[in-house]
């Protein structure tokens, strides 16, 4: 009788997960047949890494079964690094359950070669953090990092957990880091991109730069660092509220503004239409101003 072989069992399990989910991973090709991987989100829409796709009029989507469809960009969001392509014909979509990433658990990153055939990489979930904001202002429900190596052509494919459930889409982060855009973020952002072409984000119409609060004012300000107003957009929320160039922004609704990331966190997709209180230093005095956050103008 053959001895039980755990490695063989693991190999067969991974093989089964790839077979079950390979329909999720597709190739997106341009006219020169360069390609990136993507996730087939629904029969007529694929999602991939925004940073990996240019601005061509048309792309070709190729599935593992060899089916092809012409696709055009429906929307893109640099903030969450997501881009959605809408296909001109429906493709056979694979349905898998959604899962949750856990530190130390196995992760299976799928991709596609230029002909649409599945590729697979096995690694570990190295960290799972709370909600965070990218430098471009995008809100992501979790910060998931993988201990795994991906080729650039494999970026944008689905990431599965050890049970074969979908936890998100792979993307290349800082050098040497592979991140996962969580399935919860995909579920929130993709419908917005399909309907509106972009994700609305809050806007104050202010150009800001970090600055130290002058020593004599720190006691009244209650802050050591703020954001100096360097420029003001004509007709923007800041100008309407009476903000002046040279003002130092201390807080927004009581939250300290000690860097651009903190400002971005106050101007996410949920902030549009809110009235907030700005606490400012002007001419050596601390004052407040109410401002209505509007949507950032389309680029």
Sequence positions of predicted segments:
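Conserved PDZ fold ligand-binding element
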Residues: 43-48, 166-167, 238-261
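PDZ/PDZ-like domain micro-motif
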Residues: 153-159, 212-221, 233-251, 266
């Amino acid at each position: 009788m053959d001895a039980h072989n755990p490695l063989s069992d693991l190999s067969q399990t991974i093989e089964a997960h790839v077979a079950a989910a390979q329909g999720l991973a597709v190739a997106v090709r341009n006219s020169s047949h360069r390609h990136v991987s993507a996730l087939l989100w629904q029969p007529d829409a694929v999602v991939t890494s925004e940073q990996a796709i240019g601005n061509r009029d048309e792309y070709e989507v190729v599935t593992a079964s060899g089916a092809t469809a012409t696709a055009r960009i429906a929307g893109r969001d640099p903030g969450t690094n997501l881009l959605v392509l809408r296909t001109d014909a429906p493709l056979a979509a694979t349905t898998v359950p959604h899962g949750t990433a856990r530190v130390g658990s196995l992760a299976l990153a799928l991709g596609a070669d230029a002909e649409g055939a599945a590729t697979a990489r096995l690694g570990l979930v190295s960290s799972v953090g709370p909600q965070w904001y990218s430098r471009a202002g995008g809100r992501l429900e979790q910060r998931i990092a993988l201990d795994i190596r991906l080729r650039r052509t494999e970026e944008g494919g689905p990431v599965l957990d050890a049970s074969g459930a979908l936890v998100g889409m792979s993307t290349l982060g800082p050098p040497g880091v592979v991140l996962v855009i969580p399935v919860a973020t995909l579920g929130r952002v993709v419908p917005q991109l399909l309907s509106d072409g972009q994700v609305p984000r809050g806007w104050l119409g202010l150009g800001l730069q970090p600055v130290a609060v002058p020593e004599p004012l720190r006691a009244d300000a209650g802050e050591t660092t703020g954001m100096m107003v360097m420029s003001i957009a004509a007709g923007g929320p800041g100008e309407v509220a009476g903000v002046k160039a040279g003002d130092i922004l201390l807080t927004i609704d009581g939250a300290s503004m000690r860097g651009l990331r903190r400002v971005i966190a106050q101007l996410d997709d949920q902030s549009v239409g809110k009235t907030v209180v700005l606490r400012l230093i002007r001419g050596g005095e601390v004052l407040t101003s109410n401002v209505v956050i509007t949507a950032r103008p389309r680029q």
